[in-house]
């Protein structure tokens, strides 16, 4: 088991509150504040699914809404919900979840055999292959099963749901530092402000950045102070666990608030709504939704154990989980350096391949001081492994960064991260 906990006081989980849960029929333990994804990684679970066409192993890539792979079926019977991202499922006692891909089992998916015949299976081949009307019902069942999406509930939903209509002078979407400061300044001016954030606690990227300093204060202290003042302002309303999903004409925003999804089934109230739909008409809207890190492209970059660099840092700093002990990072910018330093200080062996021949000198010196092996002018050409990443093949980049100038070493690793910059 290469994934493991690294307990530190800055983690946003309560290590004094263990939580039992089940995934794919096996029992695991996490902690209050974990997501299903962080708890699975902490228990060494790497492969969470299979790809649609060739049944290639799939693992966790991100740490939030950007996650493309880790779709799960949560709970059973009338309470079941399909296609929830493990990175967005809050862990609670007794949670039951399973993977949605891999048949007959995740460890052995019959679709994996089809990879040997890939040249006979071009994109969209199934549209021209399965044309018999008489046999289509059978083909359809197999194709839908191969797609790997969850199953809709077959029983009536026993939960109740609510909706509300609201008006606000300003709606701020996003509870990171930018959104918090915007809401605070508007609230101080006496405006009617509604602040929406999808996570269980406010803070955004700051929750994964324990070393941040804002206005001369440690980031966590600054966050505590600003949230306290926001909650004291009479015309500011804060909604956490609330996702804004639609923007209509005339500044009408729709958002869904999860009221009980984070509670154990036995603790959910039958007389209270499970979720609430908010329809908010605003005079002005501020989108402070942050940015998503772009991964870099190389061979086999879909293997389990390969994440974005920011996801590796989030699991370490926010959840106290080291995805691997031997980490290789690839970056084209300065953003990955802090994460590399954090991983090295946590006891991981870290190699940082920077595609730039002349990285930022300050960050390079900080990384060396933290014990990071920085390799300027190198890139990853491919990852090695079958069910999980085992090594990374490096190549030398030319001075103009437009071509490969030579071979590089192959470095063994159990986790790999990449950073190609940020997109809003």
Regions found by a protein language model. Give the residues of each.
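Residues forming the flavin
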Residues: 2-424
């Amino acid at each position: 088991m290469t994934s493991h906990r690294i307990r530190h006081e800055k983690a946003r989980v309560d290590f004094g509150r263990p939580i039992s849960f089940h995934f794919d029929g096996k029992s695991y333990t996490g902690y209050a504040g974990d997501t299903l994804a962080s708890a699975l990684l902490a228990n060494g679970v790497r492969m969470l699914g299979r790809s649609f066409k060739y049944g290639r192993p799939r693992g966790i890539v991100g740490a939030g809404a950007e996650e493309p792979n880790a779709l799960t079926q949560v709970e059973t019977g009338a309470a079941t919900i399909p296609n929830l991202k493990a990175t967005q499922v809050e862990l609670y006692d007794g949670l039951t979840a399973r993977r949605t891909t891999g048949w007959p089992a995740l460890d052995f998916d019959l679709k994996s055999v089809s990879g040997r015949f890939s040249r006979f299976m071009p994109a969209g081949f199934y549209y021209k292959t399965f044309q018999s009307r008489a046999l289509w019902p059978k083909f359809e069942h197999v194709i839908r099963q191969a797609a790997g999406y969850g199953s809709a509930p077959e029983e009536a939903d026993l939960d109740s749901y609510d909706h509300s209509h609201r008006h606000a002078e300003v709606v701020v979407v996003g509870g990171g530092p930018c959104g918090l400061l915007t809401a605070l300044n508007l609230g101080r001016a006496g405006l009617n402000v509604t602040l929406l954030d999808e996570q269980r606690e406010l803070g955004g990227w700051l929750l994964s950045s324990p070393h941040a300093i804002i206005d001369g204060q440690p980031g966590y202290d600054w966050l505590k102070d600003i949230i306290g003042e926001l909650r004291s302002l009479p015309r500011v309303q804060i909604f956490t666990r609330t996702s804004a999903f639609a923007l209509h004409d005339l500044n009408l925003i729709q958002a869904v608030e999860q009221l009980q999804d984070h509670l154990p089934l036995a603790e959910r109230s039958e007389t209270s709504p499970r979720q609430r739909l908010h329809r908010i008409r605003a005079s002005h809207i501020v989108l402070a939704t942050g940015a998503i890190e772009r991964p870099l492209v190389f061979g086999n970059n879909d293997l389990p154990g390969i994440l974005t660099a920011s996801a590796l840092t989030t699991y370490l700093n926010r959840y106290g989980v080291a995805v691997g002990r031997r980490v290789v990072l690839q970056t084209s910018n300065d953003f990955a350096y802090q994460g590399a330093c954090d991983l090295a200080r946590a006891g991981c062996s870290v190699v940082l391949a920077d595609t730039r021949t002349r990285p930022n000198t300050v960050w390079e010196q900080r990384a060396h001081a933290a014990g990071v092996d920085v390799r300027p002018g190198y890139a990853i050409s491919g990852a090695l492994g079958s069910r999980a990443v085992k090594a990374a093949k490096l190549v030398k980049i030319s001075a103009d960064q437009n071509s490969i100038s030579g071979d590089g070493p192959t470095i063994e690793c159990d986790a790999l991260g990449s950073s190609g910059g940020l997109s809003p």
